Structures are given as structure tokens and as C-alpha cells.
Amino acid sequence: MDKLYVLVGFILMNILKKVFLSTIFVSIIFCLGILFLVKSNLGLRTIFFLSHYLVPELEVDQLIGTLNNFKLINVKYKSKNILLTIKVLQLNFIVHIFKKFYIDVNLVTCKNVNFFIKNINDVNFKTNGVFPLNLKSKFFSYFFIFFKDIRFYNFTANVDGVELFTNFFSSKGYWNKQFLELEFFKTDVVSINNFYCFDSTNNYCRFNSRNFLVCCRQYLKMLFNYFKKGNFDTFVNIDIANFSCNKIYLEDNKNISISKFFINFRIFKNSVNIKRLFFVFRRMFKVRINGFININQNYINLTINCVNKNEIYGSSSNIKIIIHGLWLSILKINFYIDKININFLIKRILMPEKLIFKCKLRLSNLNSYIHRKNFSYLNNFKLEIFTNSSEYFFQSYSVLNIKDVFPIKFCLLGIGNYKNIFLKLIKFRIFQKKILCNYEWKYCSNRDLVQKFLLNKFFDNLKKTKLLINIKKIILNNDFNEKILLLSSNFLNIRDKYIFTDVHIISGKNSFSMRSDFNSFLNLNVFFSIKDLKFFFPNFDGKFDIDVKIFRSINYYHAICKFIGNKLDFNIFKIVNIKFLIDINSKDFLNTIFLSVTKLFFGNLYVNHVFFKIKNEHDKRYLATICLSSYNNFMRLILDKYFNINVFIQTNVLRKINYFKFYLDSNVNKTVFALISYLFSNYYKKININYVSFFKHSIKSKFVKFLNKFIYVKQIF
């Protein structure tokens, strides 16, 4: 029995020995095989041969290297909505299995990468496409991955019409089982082309500055919803630090470039936490942004700091914007521009189809300079827009301080809608107070003294009276932004250029409109239409129109004033029709003066027609024409620059026509005097006297001889 046990034990020992040796041999063969596959090109080809059956859309032209250090030439992946092409892909990594399992990716290099997605909503990584085995994100939660060097050369991505291009960027990253941290190095150029957004009918709308916020929100929300739908929440957790580039081009109707771009933000599930965003826009605006955006709850909380530096004028301004609230329900925006505070409280926004909101706007300490050396303008403004956006209430308290005179206080109250503004009260108050801005007045001539004396006298008289004006209606354009600018501040300081918006005022049957642009060049257009003069002056009657235009033409200014009046009655005199035109410029001063009066009654004097005209010809000759006519008389006088006089007098009572001509030209030393008289009586008589002489003496001697001849001729006549 003992021998049997010994025999069985011996047999088992031999079997176990053979199994152990076989296991060791198989393990050695397996390790050698794995090592051979890793260190040889055959293993790389084997892996890609098997992956071709799993992902048939993946194509590779050439494989170079080993499994842990390889280079792929002409990589292409094409599916229904995805197209990916890489000319050269190089990867070098090491797998550590001792102590802690982690992967070191030493180098990832991609050259000439083109990535295209036609419609990201049609792509589903969960069921098909690149991951056909329903690979879960939990697979990557068991080990760490270190990316030491990532390089991209000529990277182009096109997703839903948005084209992104960069020539080169490099980074390094770290996967800590939960989210990916990326640290980018400096990038040269980033170009974004064909930026579109969607409207209510899912049609493409061209990107512009107005729908920038809508476009960004739509794309962010679309990406987050897509990853959430595809069960890839872990992949959304990205921490990007130190991403910087020299220039970013955002192409629209006009090319927009951003230089010195730097960003540090973290994307975690459905929120974006912007730690630091800095860029320079067109060398003048330095923008710093921090805050967070919650896409799932439509929540945003951002702080934007802008520094505007004008290198030409040597001025700078600080702008701070705080955005806080829900994106589609409540939004609070606070603006701090130097000493200006603007607060928005928007209750509801529905974009881009409709704009339905409740808004409160407050402007305080708005200090604008109409003319830096003469005027200052301080404005406190409040605007409330009700639930019905077609109505709003506004009030404005302003102080206008004029140099060396007392300040003037304005009070403005009213309501309005998109088409009209209805003013309840416009009140002017002049009060004695210390002058807000103390400027020096330098007297250069007696003219300055007279101007200041008249100005002080005018305001002294104005201070004694209480002026209260009620204007029923102000009609503006339908652009709501122009109304806000007009009501908040009459003059806007934009890069040291002053701009005045359109103003249209209707009072009774009378209207007033003005459009002006105060920038480096002055453009002004003022139009008065007075249909009821009794509205302002009960003792006067009539109607007239006044049109004044001041504009810059080439290198000098033009000023044109037109006055047209009908049935003017000023008690002392009456005018049935009057037309007046004056055209002057800063080069020749006077271009044209035109005056035409029809049926002038001045006491017992009646003039049927008065015509006066002065015109500057092309050769700088001034030609003046004066015509007077009554019931039985007519006279015309023509003068020019060289003292040429033509006089035509007709008297119907005496039935006599006198034609008088005097011509003096000092350049050719020629003097002509002519008198022609036609007397119609029982017989026809014509008297013609001509005198022509050539002198080579001075003008004084010519004039003396002319007087002697004229006296002699008059005695003969």
C-alpha cells in the first residue's frame, strides 16, 4: 500500500514538473513574442491589420517603426459626417507596469492635420463610428497618462461651418483619471474663418458683432449637450493653462485681428471656468476676462476689464464690465467707464427672433466735454423699460457749465416708445454756484473783450427770468440705440471725437431737425420749418423754412444757409415771398449771396420785386446784380470786381428809358463812359453819348479827367 502511494506521488510530481516547465516555456515564448511584437515592425502591422476589421474606415498608407515608437504616413479616416486626414503622425510612449501602472507619452507629432465634421449632432461616438465596442469613459479612470510633448503643424478643423487654422502649437498634458490638464506653449497664428450661427429655422446666419454672444452660446451648448448625450462626461473635463499666440484672425465682412492672446480656463462637465483671458485688440484695447459660464443652467458670471490707450492723442480710459445672472431669464450688466456707472437689469431675453425684456438703465457722473477749453457737461440719467418693450420712462438731470459764467441745470422727464418720444417737462434753471471747471481766458484782442461782455450780459438777463419749455413730441428714427445715446448724453466722447446724433423736434405745426458729426471734421445740418409763427410770437404771422449746412470739402469748409419765407407779417412791414441764400467757404470766404423779395410793404412804401445777387466767378471776379421794381418803375444795377457798372432805369410815367454804363479797367488803362437815353413822346428821339480814352497816367489823374469830361458832357446835355 505504501508503494502505491509512492508511485502515485511520483507520477503527480512528474506531471506537475512538466506542467510547470511547459508554463515557464510558454511564458517565456509569450514574453519573447510580446517583446518581438513591441520592438519590431511586424507587431505594428499586426495591430493595424486587426484594427482594420474593427474600424474599416481607417486607412494608413505606410507604417514605420515599432509599436511603442512608430510613424504613420497619410492617415485617413472617413465616415458619414467625419473626415480626418493626417499626413504624418508620430507617437512615442512607454508603459510602466511596476509599482504603479501609468503611461508616459514622450512625443506626439501631427503634421498637416485636416479635421472636418459636417454636422456634429449626427455624430454618435456611443453606438458607432470610431468606438464600435461601446468603449466607456470609465476605462481611462484606472491609470494615469503623462503627455510630455504634443506638437501640431498646420492644423485645420472645420466643425459645422466654423473653420479653425493654426500653423503650429505645442503643449504638454496630464490625465489624472478625472480630467485632462493641458498647458500650451506659445502659438504664432490662429485663424477662424466662416463663423456662422443658427436662427429659429436652423438656417445659417453670417457672423457679426451683434450675434457674437448668440453664436458662442449656441456652439458651447451644442458641444456640451453632445458630449453629455454620448456618455463622455469625463472627456469634457479639460483644464487648459497658458495658451498664448501672437495673432488671432477672426474673418467676417472685415478682417478682425487679435494679438497677444493668452487664456487659462477649465472645462468641467457643463461649466467653463475662465481663470484668466487676456488679449490686445487693434493695439488700443487691452482686455482681461475672468469668471465662469454654466451652460446647463444658462448661467454666466464674468468680469471684463478693458484698457483703451490712444497713442495718437495720448489718452487712456478704463472700462470694467460685470455680467452676472442667467443667460435667458435674468441678466445683470454693470459698466464702469472711468467715472461713469451704467447698470442694466434685463429680465428676459429671447434672441435672435425677438427682444422682449425689462431693463433699468442708470448713468451717473457722465462728464462730457463739448469743447474742452470752454464747456463741460455733467449728466445723471435714468431709463426704465417696462414689460411691454414699446414703452419706457426716462428722466435726466444735467448740468452745463460754461467758462467764466454760472452753471445751467437741465431737467428732462418723459415717456416714449420705439417711434416717438413724448416729453412731459423740459426745465432750465440757472443758479449761482462755484464754477465746476476753471479755465483760463486769454484776451488776445478787443474783440475777445466785446464777446465776453455780450456773453455775460446775455446770461445776466437770462438769469433774471424763469424759463420753462414744454415740448409735446420728439420724433426719432426707429433705431433704439440712437434714442439711448441721445437721451443719455448729448455729446459722446469716442476716442476724443465728439458725435451728436439725429434730433427731430415737433412743436405744434413747427418742426426742427439737426444732424451733426463733431469729430476731426465738423459736419452740421440744421433745418427749421416754422408753419405757425404765432405759436412762438403772437403778434407775428407767417411761415418760413431755414436750412443750414456746414461741411468739409477737400481742404476747406463750406457753409450754406437757405431761408424761404411766405406771407410774413411783422406789423411794420410785410413780405409776401422772400428767398435768401448765402454760400461761403474758408478759402474764398464768399461764393454766392442771393436775395429775392416779392411784394414788400414798408409803411406807405411798396416795392413789387427786389433782387440782389453776388456771385464769385471762376476767375475770382465778383459779379453783383441789384434789381428794384414797383408799379411804374424798374431799375437794374450790375457791378463787378473791376468797378464795371451797368445801370438800366425805366420809368413808365415819363415813358423814358435811361441806359448808363461806366467801365474802368486799370490793367489796360481804359475808361469807358456811355449814356443812352430813349424818350418816347410825340416824336422819337435818341441821344447817344460815348466817351473812350486811353491814359497812361495814374488812377488819380484818370479819375480827375473823367470828372471834368463828365461835367462837360452833362452841361451839353
Swiss-Prot record:
Record-given protein name: Uncharacterized protein bbp_081
Principal subcellular localisation of the protein: membrane
Domain of life of the source: Bacteria
Keyword vocabulary terms for this entry: Membrane, Transmembrane, Transmembrane helix
Cellular component terms per the entry's GO annotation: membrane
Membrane topology recorded in Swiss-Prot or TrEMBL: Single-pass membrane protein
Membrane spanning stretches: 19-38
UniProt record similarity statement: To E.coli YtfN.
Cell compartment(s), UniProt: Membrane
